[in-house]
Amino acid sequence: MVKKILAKGYIYLILLLMYLPILILMAFSFSIETQIGDGFTFGFDLWRTLFDPSEKIAQEIWTALGNTLIIAVVSAICSTILGTLGAIGAFYSKKRSQKVIELTTQIPVSNAEIVMALSLVVMFVAIGVEFNFWTLLVGHIVLSLPFVYLSVKPKLQQMDPNLYEAALDLGATPRQGLTKVIIPQTLPGIFSGFLLSITLSLDDFIVTAFTRGSGLLSGPKNIETLSTLIQAKLKKGPIPPEMRPMTVIIFFAVLAIVVLVTIYQNKTANANKVRRGRENA
């Protein structure tokens, strides 16, 4: 009995430590105080400023958010396509080739991100490429691609390797075998890799800071994402208080996506159980 109470207490303590900072941030997004330590005075001033297009800080935050989302979605799509095809190609390659590919994908995951960022900078400078949106996009793809590969690989290993050959024997073309046999079997891993790529891109600062240039919503200026904008503001002083309501918006948007994905996965799992039960009957 005591062990159960301690175990539950430990779990609740961990959850409290995880979510208490977010709850505090939510509360102070409704405070008019610029510094959290200055007390709490209820008001919607920060929310009004954030949604006021005439405010410079609001323009900077929304521009940074737009840049962040564009880079995250585009890089996630590219990483998912390349990582999925790479995992499928490695799965049907010879064992020696599989080991080489496995090693090359493990190195970026275990290596420090600063090493990857510096390597990209050296490569772009060596080939004479001007830093812009495309160099930033390549950096984010390189960052996310190994994680997509590692997300898809376990699903391929769970799949019967003879399914693809059986589809070809039954008259399917290689393209049909890929789209109608392999992709559906690995779809959960592909989707997980896509979400992980978006998360990595949204959260990244080092690769972004080293590989960005002008473009996107920033125009002729250097591309600002939320992470680089916060870092730039920290150099001049405290983080703009208008970031608090923006953080709350992002939190609830991510929460809604997680809830929808969980509901979809549960429905899919239940449908698969019903189908297997009918097949066994």
Report the location of each language-model feature:
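N-terminal signal-anchor/first transmembrane alpha helix
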Residues: 1-25
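C-terminal transmembrane helix and the adjacent membrane-cytosol boundary/short C-terminal tail
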Residues: 2-10, 153-164, 168, 178-181, ...
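Transmembrane-helix boundary motif in ABC transporter permease subunits
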Residues: 3-4, 73-105, 262-266
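Short membrane-interfacial helix/loop motifs at transmembrane-helix boundaries
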Residues: 20-57, 212-221, 281
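Non-cytoplasmic
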Residues: 25-34, 140, 148, 189-232
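Interhelical loop and adjacent transmembrane-helix boundary motif
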Residues: 46-58, 202-267, 274
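Generic hydrophobic transmembrane alpha-helix motif, especially the helices
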Residues: 102, 106-136, 188-192
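Membrane-cytosol interface at the C-terminal ends of specific transmembrane alpha-helices
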Residues: 130-169, 176-182, 193-197
